[in-house]
């Protein structure tokens, strides 16, 4: 049996436990839901060989009814090349990250482009709205429910500066993408962004 089904079960247990902790007023029930949450973390730790503390930091720190997180990616394409950033782990990705409260999805795309790539951009239109687990995540982190929004962005100007998240940036043709790409964006998703760039009538893809 593949790890994927165990990740799915752990994800469901985590969601049930978090909802129970939010709504239950009974002390004994909350203790049971807390135990269910810990079991889900222990399952993921065994599957992934990641430390239990790391798992709990990711999955056991939220409160309230569990809803998907939102990740925004900026597809900055200029003269047929896409701007990617190299993360501290050596992997390349489109600039992006968790959407900040108080900003619209498009505003988040603009912010992430500047913070991670030093690029001033304009968010033109959405390319895709994807469920991370269905398109990107096959490791333990895919247990987090994430919606990924890709925006096609026009490049204005900018200058890269190394920062706490990225150490390098570069422009790439689709046929010359770096080998070590992050799971934060697949080659298929990058290809969709090029298709949107080449076709003004491109229709946003969604799960």
Question: Locations of the language-model features?
Answer:
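Unchanged
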Residues: 99-123, 131-189, 205-206
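Acidic, metal-coordinating catalytic segment for phosphate/diphosphate chemistry
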Residues: 27-30, 34-73
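N-terminal strand-loop-strand
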Residues: 56-93, 121, 125
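Long alpha-helical scaffolds
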Residues: 10, 17, 37-40, 117
